[in-house]
């Protein structure tokens, strides 16, 4: 600017921004940006990096930096009932800068990292279930759990970081993946997007294993969703030695039929001793105990050996690691109570599959793909998941483990408006089936509370040795 060019800073910046960004017809500067604009422009001799979002021709300027190489960051967060996982990414390259996971309480990146980059976070995408979405926004979630199970909202846009007190640029956009029903939330719309079942001609099934087991069935023509209360067992909750899939978690188990000795796969570096057992390990150990006839179809111990013990009440348990073998100096075992809890969790999943398919006059023979998601370990032994009656007894090549699809979907939304639009489209077009009001669901659930099922004809390949 000069005495002959007295255009105000805001207008000068707006004109240059419109010229620099293709498709930009209007520029809006946030209050946070205007407050520091004069000093930043002059410190940088009017050579600045403009950061913001361009939507429908409107550029919302969130920051003006004198550093030409200042990074653009985004956050993707999966808020589960049991676990919260988040990643910090470079929006320009997609490179992950940091990752953190914790029990659902408070999640933090390292203090030094967040202090350096907080003002450069311009988009935050969150995928969580319906209840967690309500709690995050401070909205009453009680109606979600009471008949007729009506949430306050399915979708809510227009929020910024300052609205939620989120550690980011105060004008950073907060995007919630939209909910579908009372118990099918944004974690599933984001997950269904990741699975790509919406882009296939064949029928596929998507299953997210968590405290709420959530399912989506369909193809490019239609999709149906439902949810069942599986409890936290898949994530190690309600299991005496259960834990999340972090260092020290037993994630795979093989048991010798004759000696009853276990071979354990443990999360962590070589030599890592076991601390507890995560979801994938629980599936394995129950399947192996059943395969080797150590437990009955009711989950009760029927064989004796040095790895099988009983408490003063006669309650049996299988010892995966003695106190001397564990990292903590405490015995790691799975009890009959643990097994019963997990049988109920797997029964909820299988009965939900049956009810959803039968509501469409279909059965598992129509499935061309079964995608399984959830943060329960580095993978699932599908053979064992079928053996215990959690997944249908179909060709194992049809199964694929996708990991944390809720987080993957949130990551895609953070980097692409096209992904945001597609997730919104999936949510608006998906039919929601309320299992809690289905009169057949409880009968199906009770029938599935055995290993593998009361109807053995459904699981011809599940045999005991």
Where are these regions (language model features)?
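Nucleotide/phosphate-binding catalytic cleft detector across ATP-hydrolyzing
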Residues: 1-76, 81, 93, 119-123, ...
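Glycine-rich phosphate-binding loop of actin/hexokinase-like ATP-binding domains
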Residues: 80-81, 86-88, 94-112, 143-158, ...
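Phosphate/ATP-binding catalytic cores across multiple sugar-kinase/actin-like superfamilies
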Residues: 119, 188-191, 195, 343-365
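Catalytic phosphate/nucleotide-handling subdomain of diverse soluble enzymes
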Residues: 219-224, 238-239, 358, 362-426
């Amino acid at each position: 600017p000069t005495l002959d060019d007295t255009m105000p800073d805001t207008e000068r910046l707006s004109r240059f921004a419109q010229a620099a960004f293709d498709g930009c017809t209007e520029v809006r500067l946030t209050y946070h940006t205007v407050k520091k604009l004069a000093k930043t422009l002059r410190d940088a001799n009017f050579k600045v990096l403009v950061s913001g979002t361009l939507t429908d021709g409107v550029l919302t300027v969130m920051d003006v930096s004198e550093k030409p190489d200042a990074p653009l960051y985004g956050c993707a967060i999966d808020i589960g009932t049991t676990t919260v996982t988040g990643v910090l990414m470079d929006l320009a390259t997609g490179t992950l800068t940091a990752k953190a996971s914790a029990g659902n309480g408070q999640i933090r990146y390292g203090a030094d990292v967040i202090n350096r980059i907080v003002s450069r976070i311009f988009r935050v995408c969150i995928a969580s279930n319906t209840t967690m979405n309500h709690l995050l926004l401070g909205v009453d979630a009680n109606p979600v759990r009471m008949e007729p199970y009506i949430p306050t909202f399915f979708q809510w846009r227009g929020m910024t970081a300052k609205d939620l007190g989120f550690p980011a640029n105060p004008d950073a956009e907060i995007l919630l993946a939209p909910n579908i029903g009372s118990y099918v939330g944004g974690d599933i719309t984001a997950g269904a997007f990741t699975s790509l079942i919406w882009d296939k001609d064949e029928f596929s099934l998507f299953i997210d294993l968590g405290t709420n087991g959530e399912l989506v069935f369909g193809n490019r023509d239609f999709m149906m969703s439902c949810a069942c209360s599986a409890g936290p067992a898949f994530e190690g909750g309600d299991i005496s030695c259960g834990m999340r899939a972090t260092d020290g978690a037993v994630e795979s188990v093989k048991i010798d039929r004759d000696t009853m000795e276990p071979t354990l796969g443990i999360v962590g570096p070589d030599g890592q001793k076991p601390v507890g057992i995560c979801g994938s390990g629980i599936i394995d150990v129950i399947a192996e105990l059943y395969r080797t006839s150590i437990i009955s179809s009711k989950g009760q111990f029927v064989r004796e050996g040095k790895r099988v013990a009983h408490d003063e009440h006669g309650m049996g348990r299988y010892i995966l690691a003695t106190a001397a073998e564990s990292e903590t100096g405490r015995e790691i075992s799975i009890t009959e109570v643990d097994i019963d809890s997990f049988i109920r969790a797997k029964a909820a999943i299988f009965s939900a599959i049956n009810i959803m398919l039968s509501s469409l006059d279909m059965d598992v023979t129509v499935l061309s793909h079964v995608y399984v998601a959830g943060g329960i370990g580095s993978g699932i032994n599908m053979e064992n998941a079928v053996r215990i009656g959690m997944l249908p007894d179909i060709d194992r090549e049809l199964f694929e483990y996708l990991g944390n699809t809720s987080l993957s979907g949130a990551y895609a939304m953070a980097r692409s408006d096209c992904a945001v639009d597609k997730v919104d489209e999936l949510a608006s077009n998906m039919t929601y089936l309320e299992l809690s009001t289905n009169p057949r669901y409880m009968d199906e659930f009770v029938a599935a509370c055995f290993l593998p099922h009361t109807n053995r004809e459904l699981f011809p390949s599940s045999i005991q040795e």
